[in-house]
Amino acid sequence: MLQGNVICEEDILTSVCSNLNEIVMKTLHINANFDFYGLKSEGYYTIHNKNKSFEDKRIDLNMRLYFNEENENEFLYAYILWFSVNPKKIGIGSLIINEIIEVLKHLTNIEFIIIHPKDKEVKNFWIKNKFIEDHKLNSDKRININTRRILSYYI
């Protein structure tokens, strides 16, 4: 809904979810049914897909969009909590991640995306998709995540 001349965050989140549904339908032919939940007062909203699989295809995405504390009407960064796709090793995950990045670039004002890879194979996937080890983010007070081993992608 419009508030004055400003588009509110729920409209942005609805658009992000709609675009993610289109990406997954086009790529995997799954109605992923992306949705969001959370409260602005918590500092972030979580986006996730309710439908995870169809036949031998599967996608699971869970990410948060965090607000900028200096401007509470804008998102500062996205934190991908979980991303998994099947089939693997044929480029579908990379295709989907790159399209997600494009959606976030066009619909939000986020500065960067972060991920905390669970193991070396996962880390290599993200590095292949242009995420980098960035130690300066470890001391960035704007990030509400207490982890040291994060990869980032700057928008």
Name these PLM-found stretches.
Residues 1-40:
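Short amphipathic alpha-helix that is part of the acyltransferase structural core
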Residues 32-62:
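Conserved beta-hairpin
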Residues 57-73:
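A conserved beta-strand-loop-helix scaffold within acyl/acetyltransferase catalytic domains
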Residues 73-86:
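Conserved acetyl-CoA binding element of GNAT-fold acetyltransferases
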Residues 90-103:
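Conserved acetyl-CoA-binding loop-helix of GNAT-fold acetyltransferases
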Residues 108-110:
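Short, high-confidence coil segments that cap the C-terminus of an alpha-helix
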Residues 114-124, 139-143:
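Conserved beta-strand-loop-alpha-helix junction that forms the acyl-donor binding cleft
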Residues 127-136:
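Conserved acetyl-CoA-binding loop of GNAT-fold acetyltransferases
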